[in-house]
């Protein structure tokens, strides 16, 4: 909730962003009371199950279908969210996302993407260590996805792709 409070202050309490919060409702409410954020900026979705940092993706898929991570990703399949932020288990996040969000037919592996701020604007960095083994097709797919993301974010710029691991 403190992060939402900082975001709202930084953006002059603009109502063009709404937060769907997934997790233990009691814990979220305690934080909400500390930060005094208007409910017009968020909605709480209670999830009683937690994915631990030690949990394997396979175990999480079997046991965590009511977890905050599962529910947050699933909210994107139902078009209730466009963005999911997680500070949790990245391996589980990647597998749950791949399972629920799927990929387009021509893409065999998804890639994690990060926006990397620099002195002039932002860079797009893909994969971020999520895929240990990549073949030529995966690298082409990552290049196309990265270029498409960059063009969507910065339509006036030319997307220049650098391949690090060949």
Roles of regions detected by a PLM:
Residues 56-63:
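Short, surface-exposed amphipathic charged segments that create phosphate/polyanion-binding patches used
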């Amino acid at each position: 909730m403190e992060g939402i409070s900082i975001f709202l202050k930084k953006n002059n309490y603009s109502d063009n962003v709404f937060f769907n919060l997934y997790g233990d409702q009691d814990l979220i409410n305690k934080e909400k009371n500390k930060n005094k954020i208007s409910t017009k900026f968020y909605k709480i979705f209670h999830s009683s199950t937690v994915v631990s940092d030690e949990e394997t993706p396979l175990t999480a898929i079997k046991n965590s279908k009511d977890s905050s991570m599962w529910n947050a990703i699933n909210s994107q399949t139902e078009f209730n969210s466009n963005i999911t932020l997680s500070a949790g288990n990245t391996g589980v996040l990647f597998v749950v996302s791949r399972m629920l969000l799927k990929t387009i037919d021509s893409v065999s592996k998804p890639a994690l993407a990060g926006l990397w701020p620099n002195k002039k604007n932002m860079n797009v960095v893909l994969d971020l260590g999520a895929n240990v083994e990549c073949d030529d097709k995966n690298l082409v797919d990552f290049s196309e996805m990265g270029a498409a993301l960059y063009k969507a974010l910065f339509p006036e710029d030319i997307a220049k792709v650098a391949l690090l691991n060949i």
